[in-house]
Curated annotation (Swiss-Prot):
Entry-linked InterPro entries: DUF237 (IPR004306), DUF240 (IPR004319)
Family of this protein: Belongs to the MG032/MG096/MG288 family.
Lineage: Bacteria, Bacillati, Mycoplasmatota, Mycoplasmoidales, Mycoplasmoidaceae
Annotated protein name in UniProt: Uncharacterized protein MPN_049
Name of a matching Pfam family: DUF240
Length: 632
């Protein structure tokens, strides 16, 4: 388990530590060491061990004076540096050809404030998104991810884009972090250093570059808890050996000033709870390097306006829509709760009214001992329970105070009703039967081939490829009560039986049918059956046992087509819907035919789903049938 946990974390955190907005990517190459503009960024490239800027001694071959570079090394007031840049070009054209080394340094100093403002905005927007989600919360993976959405609105050359796409993380890797949202992000530190290195070709030639470094600390929260990530984003200009080369590295088209930057992320620390995953993340990220043509106008110079526009787009196209969705969901929830409360209140009043109508509880209890008592009790109170509508009303009234006794009467009525219906070894075709069960007769259990539960496919195969007949054997149909402690798990405070309630009631009996019959395949199918070792015909006795009870298990109620756990009065159709748990067992003496039944899973079949899902019957119809028979 520990190995699988670490393997998962290696995949997850090494690929998703980009802050959801700052996710450290599994990087794809955009440059190589063979590229003439290649710049090698190192973890310690910009700072020496004592924390001072590492500026090398300059000789007479430099295009820049030592005094100028020394001054740059000390100018760490980034806000003042960038203010100086703006003053320098306040009244003259912003032309890269007029840039000095100090101008470039001061321009890049503006990154500190622009990135800090961007990070601040991300935090503010994430707070607003979280507040909108608090209206009526959804799962964390459904909450808009601010970094992903926000940087989708910025210009192509905006830098840095602190989201998975902006940091070149693959979609399949970034998706691993969808369950996490940014909790807090901070730009902890920023630095710029002018670096010098010897040319790898010309021995006496030196090259320079500006190295930028952003240090971030971020926290994410999601289904897996909190993640803390501290990382750096290192960037560098192209190498230059003179001021002219530095100026040439910039480009201006219209009002847009751009420059080429090479960059990479570096993991400093990654923790998940008490687990330190720093080394895993560093190994996964590696030393991949990217290059981008950065729009310095939107990234620094006009950053405030660019971010404002982006913020407005986010608030209009993401935040406002999400907030409206949550408000609508809350309103719908409240309306539904009000509807349910109203419905429950109406039911409560109705039950209270029914309770008050019971003048003699003992008489009511005694009326539930048998069919004759039940009929007599309600006749005295002006109800004709031979009428199905009045029967349902009587059952509801009695059930309001004596649900277990009513349930016992109903299940006894089901047992006796089945026995009475098949007492002549065939379905009852009387007027009473049709009145109680309808023109099609008793829905459960049926006899003959239609009474055997099987898949629709198998039933079709048997019908189309052969002849099958089953007839009830004389005086061999039995209904046997197995359980005496009969009760129903009725919870009045929850409206009775819940939608997916397991083990909702306790009763059990079995129905045994003994058939005489057989089957034979069509001659063509019989040939193929013989080749396949399948009996082409059978003749003899078949025992079919149905065990009916209320043991509705969890693996039944979780099936997609589970009808629901019913014990529900239906006033519109005058029925009492009732969900059964049924197990079917079939046995024959013929060994080869019995083996065929076993192969088809018909020897022991638990009705759960599809064409063999739990039956839903009108439980009151069996009692109605007995009442009609008693009165006839």
């Amino acid at each position: 388990m520990r190995f699988r946990y670490k393997a998962f974390l290696l995949t997850l955190f090494a690929s998703t530590t980009t802050l959801t907005g700052f996710i450290i990517p599994t990087l794809s190459q955009h440059g190589s060491s063979t590229d003439p503009s290649f710049v090698a960024l190192r973890n310690n490239s910009s700072l020496s061990c004592d924390g001072k800027s590492r500026l090398l001694e300059f000789g007479n071959d430099l295009g820049f004076s030592k005094e100028e570079t020394d001054v740059l090394a000390k100018q760490k007031n980034w806000e003042q540096n960038y203010t100086n840049f703006k003053k320098q070009f306040e009244h003259k054209l912003l032309d890269p050809k007029s840039f000095s080394l100090t101008d470039v340094y001061n321009l890049f100093s503006g990154f500190q404030q622009s990135v800090a403002d961007t990070v601040k905005l991300m935090n503010e927007l994430q707070t607003q998104v979280n507040k909108a989600n608090d209206i009526y919360p959804v799962e964390s993976f459904q909450v808009p991810k601010v970094p992903q959405k926000l940087f989708g609105f910025v210009d192509q050359g905006f830098f840095p884009k602190l989201n998975p796409k902006g940091l070149n993380i693959a979609d399949n890797v970034a998706s691993l972090f969808e369950k996490y949202s940014l909790k807090q992000a901070t730009l902890k530190d920023f630095d710029i250093v002018l670096e010098k290195k010897n040319d790898i070709v010309l021995e006496h030639k030196v090259r320079y570059n500006f190295a930028l470094q952003f240090h971030f600390e971020t926290t994410y929260i999601g289904s897996g808890g909190e993640i803390n990530l501290q990382f750096a984003l290192q960037a560098s200009t192209t190498n230059f050996s003179s001021l002219e080369e530095l100026q040439a590295s910039f480009s201006k088209v219209g009002n847009n000033l751009t420059a080429q930057l090479f960059w990479k992320p570096v993991v400093n620390k990654l923790t998940s709870g008490e687990n330190d995953l720093t080394h895993i993340a560093q190994t996964a990220v590696g030393e991949s390097l990217f290059d981008s043509r950065v729009d310095l106008t939107s990234s620094i110079i006009n950053n405030e306006a660019a971010i404002k526009t982006t913020q407005q787009q986010f608030e209009t196209e993401v935040l406002a829509l999400f907030k409206a969705e949550r408000e609508k969901a809350l309103a719908e929830y409240k309306a539904e709760q009000e509807r349910i409360a109203k419905e429950l209140e109406e039911q409560r009043k109705e039950l209270e009214r029914l309770k008050k109508e019971q003048q003699n509880k003992q008489e009511l209890v005694e009326s539930l001992y048998n069919v004759a008592n039940f009929v007599s009790y309600w006749e005295k109170r002006g109800k004709d329970v031979t009428d199905k509508k009045q029967l349902i009303q009587a059952l509801k009234s009695a059930f309001a105070t004596n649900w277990n006794e009513v349930f016992q009467l109903l299940t006894a009525g089901m047992r006796e009703g089945i026995k009475e219906y098949y007492k002549h070894n065939k379905p009852d075709q009387s007027a009473n039967a049709k009145k109680a069960f309808g023109q099609n007769g008793l829905a459960f259990p049926r006899t003959g081939f239609d009474g055997i539960y099987m898949s629709d496919w198998l039933r079709g195969e048997l019908r189309n490829k052969g002849n099958i007949n089953l007839h009830l054997k004389q005086n061999e149909t039995t209904v046997k009560k197995i359980r005496d402690d009969i009760s129903i798990e009725w919870n009045e405070s929850k409206g009775g039986i819940e939608f997916h309630q397991t083990y909702p009631y306790w009763f059990e009996f079995e129905v045994n049918f003994k058939y005489i019959g057989g089957y034979s395949l069509n001659w063509w199918d019989a040939i193929w059956a013989k080749v396949a070792g399948i009996p082409g015909s059978w003749k003899g006795e078949m025992n079919l046992k149905l065990v009916i009870d209320g043991e509705i298990h969890k693996w039944m109620v979780t099936k997609p087509d589970y009808p629901r756990t019913f014990f529900q009065f239906d006033d519109q159709f005058d029925k009492l819907w009732f969900t059964l748990h049924v197990s079917q067992e079939i046995s024959v003496r013929d060994e080869s035919f019995m083996n065929l039944l076993k192969k088809q899973g018909l020897d022991k079949l638990d009705l759960r789903t599809g064409s063999t899902k739990p039956p839903v019957v009108d439980l009151a119809s069996y009692l109605h049938y007995l009442i009609l028979a008693d009165k006839s």
